Amino acid sequence: ETALDAIRSMSRLYPEAIAKLVEDKANGPAIIDTLRREITGIMPVSPGADSKEARAASVSPVFEAGQVFVPHPRWKPEIEDMLEEWIGFPNMPHDDNVDSMVYAVRKLTRRAKGPVIRF
């Protein structure tokens, strides 16, 4: 499955999602250009100059404070892979879900009115 296919699929699966964040590097600009006309809410995000490890560390206090909730794997079995990647970071072969989590937590904590972020 390509990144375009994945974004299209997730957009169909979660039509209530207002923003779809796409990293503005590598093939991200081409994806943004292609999907912006097709899917509402496509937004570029920049990783900035910090390392992936530093970006992940910047949101760890939100997790440590108990302000992020994820579905139990019993109800959402697909969460297992994501949790494994988060917990095993940076020693996992893939870490795209870590980036996605960082962008989501940063965006939601900037906009959150209350202390709880629900996923």
Protein language model regions, located:
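Mg2+-dependent endonuclease catalytic cores in nucleic-acid-processing enzymes, primarily RNase H-like
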Residues: 1-89
